[in-house]
């Protein structure tokens, strides 16, 4: 597989030459039964400064990635989602783009524009849930809002000690809109969800590990190496059994259609308020990353 590169993200095949998978029921179609197989996975790298904000360009590329991954089940065993941006994994939705959309779209059409975006990102993250491949988020630094929601759509989160997690959307008069709350509810108790949502406070990697949000914590800068170790271990297992176990443990649809519609409806309703427009205006006027930090 040749690497694919866009301005906002890229993906490539990673093969561990030191690991032989042998042969057997997991042998990919077209592979010779006598040829030792190597542990292989796909790495999706986010690289949009300042902190991988998810706007139209990133969403377009994510949709391309999901379409691509659907044809790679024969050889891939896992997907690692990572960031090359020093500030962190992902700061969430591109609020500047949202602000521009609200400025240039007629008031009565704003909800429809936002709704289309949300429905598309929901489909992308639902594909992560439904994929037979194990998905691993390797996170560091800022993992806020929509970035937190992307990580929650993965089967495992591996974080380094610099990682911080938060849902700061209520500070803007909004709610998380990428399905993160239902996904969080399947991992932790209701009181934890309410605390993170209603206070907007951030938690560090150690606290996330205690709560069960994170599976492992690495030294600063080592999350990707640890995630690769996990992918290497998963790649040694029978792929059919891995997919079956994932489907059994993790619901394919953490959001019912009713929940998804209710979340999107509420987000769009809140988006129409003057208070949200004012909050976005204030955010855009800042040239600092400080608004990301609760």
Where are these regions (language model features)?
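Glycine- (often His-adjacent) and acidic-residue-rich active-site loop
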Residues: 83-123, 143
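Conserved CoA-thioester-binding segment of acyl-CoA-metabolizing enzymes
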Residues: 1-21, 25-27, 31-84, 126
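C-terminal long alpha-helix characteristic of the crotonase
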Residues: 158-163, 214-262, 269, 291-294
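Well-ordered beta-strand positions
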Residues: 156, 195, 199-201, 207, ...
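Terminal low-complexity tails and localization/encapsulation signals of metabolic enzymes
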Residues: 1-9, 280-294
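Short helix- or helix-capping micro-motifs
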Residues: 91-93, 184, 192-201
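Glycine-rich beta-to-alpha active-site loop
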Residues: 120-172
